[in-house]
Every structure is written in structure tokens, then in C-alpha cells.
Amino acid sequence: DMVRSHIERSTPNKVDYFKSTLEQLYGIKTTLKHMKVDTDKLRPTQDRVYADELEGRTYELKRGLAEPAIVVKTGNRWILVDGHHRSVASKKLGCEKVDSYVIDLGQDIRLGMEKTADEAGIKTFDDITIIDDDQHPLIALTETIKDQQYKED
């Protein structure tokens, strides 16, 4: 869980990289804010989350350890870029807001990830499937590596 948490972190570098990518891609200047965003305003862009990862994010949220999500504000839309497990866990816990890094585009630009979400029929958190019968790929990889190291010892 510790390894996964480090990889899943919304580090300032990760946020800055995504911010600069948007600026270059669309030829705009964005602003960055750290704020709470209403869960009902968030537009997810991912169609599934893994139950084991959801359990980890729920644990972190209950203890105040969860990293902020990454959200893009474009026009009057709040697009969830990173933090689907955290946001679903927040919603399940009854939280009305999600701690987020918000990249504000300052104008209405339809993002590619919005188009992809539209094509997949993802509009709200109700459209996200929780996968119970499989592990998050990162957890499966971590456990495979641990098993290999155990066999070598």
C-alpha cells in the first residue's frame, strides 16, 4: 500500500506537468488553485475503479491522508482528471466536497478526455463500475514483484 500511495500521489510536479501540457496544447495560460470542489459538480472521465484501491482511498480519507484530486475547470464544467478512486470514496462516505488541485482554463475548451467520456457514456459517478473480482493493475504488479523476490530469497 505504501508503494501504491507514493505512485498515486498528486505531487506538485504531476500537477504542474499536466498544467503546462494543457497550456501548450491549447495555447492558453491557466491558473492553479487548491480548493474543495462539490462532488456533484465533478465530471468523471474513467469508467471503472477497483474495490481494493477504493478501500485504500477510503482508509486514507477517514484519516485525513488522501492526496488532492486533479480537476480541470473549463467553462462551467469541472472535469476530474486524476483521483477517481478518492472521489468515489468521498462520495460513498457522504462527503459533499473533494480536496482538489483545480487547473482553471479561463475559457470553455472541450477537452479530449471529455469527448472520450461522452463516447463511453460517463457523465456522473453512477456511471463508474466498481470492479470487485480483480485487483488494481498496480497492486497485482506489486504483489507479483513481491512474490518473485520471495522466491529468490
Task: Describe each region flagged by the PLM.
Residues 3-4, 30, 59, 67, ...:
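Polar low-complexity intrinsically disordered regions enriched in Ser/Thr and small residues
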Residues 8-15, 35, 106, 131-134:
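Intrinsic-disorder-associated interaction segments
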Residues 2, 17, 53-56, 112, ...:
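Exposed alpha-helical structural elements
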Residues 18-81, 85, 91:
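Short alpha-helix boundary/capping and kink motifs at helix termini
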Residues 7, 11, 26, 62, ...:
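Generic secondary-structure transition motif, activating predominantly at the C-termini of alpha-helices
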Residues 1-29:
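N-terminal leader/domain-start detector
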